[in-house]
Amino acid sequence: MTLAVRRWAIVPAAGQGSRFGAGLPKQYVAVLGRPLLSWTLSSLLAGPRVDGIVVALAPGDRHWRDLPEAHDPRVRHCAGGARRELSVANGLEALAGNASDTDWVLVH
């Protein structure tokens, strides 16, 4: 029996954007009327090539639940880390129970 290869995406989004100076994390800054993170997630979800997404978020993120994509069953979230590589590691750990050894993982 051959298992279908699934494709997952990890989106590190735990940054605070303090250098960006917008008053909120840059992933939530509106671009053409939508938060940047919403554009990213909707683009990944629109294609047939991504089976699921894990978004690594800062503890206490107050903006996540406002995104429509946060309620899509293909999208889950995990705690982000203090640095990008820690957020990616947490995303991989969050996939551990669902992804198989032959699956692919895209890191945005």
Task: Locate each region found by the language model.
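Short aromatic-hydrophobic micro-motifs that form the base-stacking/packing surface
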Residues: 104-108
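Conserved N-terminal catalytic core of the sugar/cofactor nucleotidyltransferase
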Residues: 2, 38-102
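N-terminal glycine-rich phosphate-binding loop and ensuing alpha1 helix
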Residues: 6-59
